[in-house]
Swiss-Prot record:
Enzyme class: hydrolase
Name of the protein in question: Mannosyl-3-phosphoglycerate phosphatase
Family, as annotated: Belongs to the HAD-like hydrolase superfamily. MPGP family.
Keywords: Cytoplasm, Hydrolase, Magnesium, Metal-binding
Domain of life: Bacteria
Binding residues for Mg(2+): D13, D15, D214
Needed co-factor(s): Mg(2+)
Gene Ontology MF terms: magnesium ion binding; mannosyl-3-phosphoglycerate phosphatase activity
Organism: Escherichia coli O157:H7
GO biological-process terms attached to the record: mannosylglycerate biosynthetic process
Compartments (UniProt record): Cytoplasm
Reactions catalysed according to its record: 2-O-(alpha-D-mannosyl)-3-phosphoglycerate + H2O = (2R)-2-O-(alpha-D-mannosyl)-glycerate + phosphate
């Protein structure tokens, strides 16, 4: 059993979880965001998005100054008060976006895999794909340690592509709508564990953790949480955890921010 009282950390995915997958609306979650803010409970955003995108959204959601996890864990944006930590303001895991792009271009040219990366198109095209404004779409291209792409080949070729990436120390990860390539050592779980350890070091006590997500790439994050909310999502693969004890895992009936609210209601309102 746990409560909204400190120490508590809430880790949340964005698209399809805190934000509606299509409209990007988050208002159903607003009352809980306000309540958590008033209780001084950090809400740490975790996403495949770039840090530039997430800093914009963090401000919109009233969460500015808190740490966040970008690019599926390849980038950690540090909290404003963590200026003494090496690497401030961001810690980047593994190889850079530019190096990954070079690998992908080589694989495409020499082994003829079919895919389109965000680097291949302009912000107008990304805006069309995502429903974002052009200014917001431009932020999606500011990757530091990953590449986002649309797969345009067969499942058989995908298996071959994944194997080639693994040989090169990279991983191929499915998000809510797109695929992502990043260093094999990076992950939302690794980044979350680092943030949890930092809060523990600063406060002297390990915080209780609650995570919320809707896609396969959220599973590693939810596995390392004390409690998890699996928000009903659009992804056909869904989210499957090794430990789905009902005492610690809740699957919502609603999607997006309404599911986010449902998950918080389940774990806190009854306590």
């Amino acid at each position: 059993m746990f409560s909204i009282q400190q120490p508590l950390l809430v880790f949340s995915d964005l698209d399809g979880t805190l934000l509606d997958s299509h409209s990007y609306d988050w208002q159903p979650a607003a009352p809980w965001l306000s309540r958590l803010r008033e209780a001084n409970v950090p809400v740490i955003l975790c996403s495949s998005k770039t840090s530039a995108e997430m800093l914009y959204l963090q401000k919109m959601l009233g969460l500015q100054g808190l740490p966040l996890i970008a690019e599926n864990g390849a980038v950690i944006q540090l909290a404003e008060q963590w200026q003494e930590i090496d690497g401030f303001p961001r810690i980047i895991s593994g190889i850079s976006h530019g190096e990954i792009s070079q690998v992908l271009n080589t694989l495409r040219e020499k082994e003829h895999f079919k895919f389109t990366t965000f680097d291949d198109v302009d912000d107008a095209t990304i805006a069309e794909w995502t429903g974002l404004s052009r200014s917001q779409a431009a932020l999606t291209q500011l990757h530091e340690a990953s590449v986002t792409l649309i797969w345009r080949d067969s499942d058989e070729r995908m298996a071959q592509f994944t194997a080639r990436l693994n040989e090169l120390g990279l991983q191929f990860m499915q998000g809510a709508r797109f695929w992502h390539v990043l260093d094999a050592s990076a992950g939302k779980d690794q980044a979350a564990n680092w943030i949890i350890a930092t809060y523990q070091q600063l406060s002297g006590k390990r915080p209780t953790t609650l995570g919320l997500g809707d896609g396969p790439n959220d599973a590693p994050l939810l596995e390392v949480m004390d409690y998890a909310v699996i928000v009903k999502g659009l992804n056909r693969e869904g989210v499957h955890l090794h430990d789905e004890d009902p005492a610690r895992v809740w699957r919502t009936q609603r999607e997006g921010p309404e599911g986010w609210r449902e998950g918080l209601d389940h774990f806190f309102s009854a306590r």
